[in-house]
Amino acid sequence: GWRHRVYAFLAQGWQGTDRQWRHYKAAYLFLAALAPPLVISVHSVVSWDFAQSIVPGWHSTIFAPYFVAGAIHSGLAMVITLLIPLRRIFRLDTYITQAHLENLAKLIILTGLIVGYAYVVESYIAGYSNNVPEWQRFIYQVTGEYAIPFWIMILFNSLVPLLLFVKRIRTSTPWLFGIAILINIGMWCERFVIIVTGLAHEYDPSSWGLFIPTWVDISITVGSFAWFFLWFLLFVKHLPAVSITEVKEGATADPLVGEHP
């Protein structure tokens, strides 16, 4: 059917020869080595889009590592959020083991500590710089109308991940899934706090105000989530959720891999 034609086109003449496997593994390693600097460069550039402005709360040199750590932190949480239901629904326990989830949890501990450090440095800069608008914006951020998203950000992104130091929690799938959901919420609040509080409390008091989302804002936000999950579910439905290459490599290394009771 149409799937066979699509897969044949995407295979591009793949026959599984020894030469093709060697080229595949070389390309695989190259792309794996390319990914980390690409992530760092992309999110650093995005952060500098903010840091190059003079908006209080944005003009900070901490933004580059802050954004990189935050991107990895939220990315790990989203991977766990998607991986755990996928593992359960499709019974992929053989390929996605508890060890994989525990290692992801350990990485979340690391990125959570880095993000927490960035929060501390950000508050320190606001107080130490003797910049009155910067300090006023920080106080407004902590105690003003948007204090709830700020404290949710601090709690969910920095303090909740510390629970993963406990091995019993780190190896518990429900606990891990719940913590990942909270981190996703916290990272969304972080983006909200960065953008809204900075623009709501700038230099000119006459421009101060509250951001009240309209139906357009809400529709765009909900539509973004719907768009992502639409393509994710279509991918899971029509393409292998686990790389067949890695499944075959695992089966070659361990004949028991792939067998189900």
List each model region and its residues.
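C-terminal TM-helix exit segments that contain a strictly Trp-centered aromatic cap at the helix terminus
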Residues: 118-125, 187-197
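Alpha-helical transmembrane segments of multi-pass membrane proteins
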Residues: 115, 183-187, 233
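Hydrophobic, well-ordered secondary-structure elements that form the walls
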Residues: 117, 161, 191, 240
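Membrane-interface transmembrane-helix boundary segments in multi-pass integral membrane proteins
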Residues: 61-70, 132-154, 161, 172, ...
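Extramembrane terminal tails and long inter-domain/linker segments of multi-pass membrane proteins
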Residues: 1-26, 98-99, 201-212, 221-261
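Central hydrophobic cores of alpha-helical transmembrane segments
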Residues: 175-185
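Membrane-helix interface "capping/anchor" motifs
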Residues: 165-176
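Long, contiguous internal "core" modules enriched in hydrophobic/ aromatic residues
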Residues: 1-153, 166, 248-249
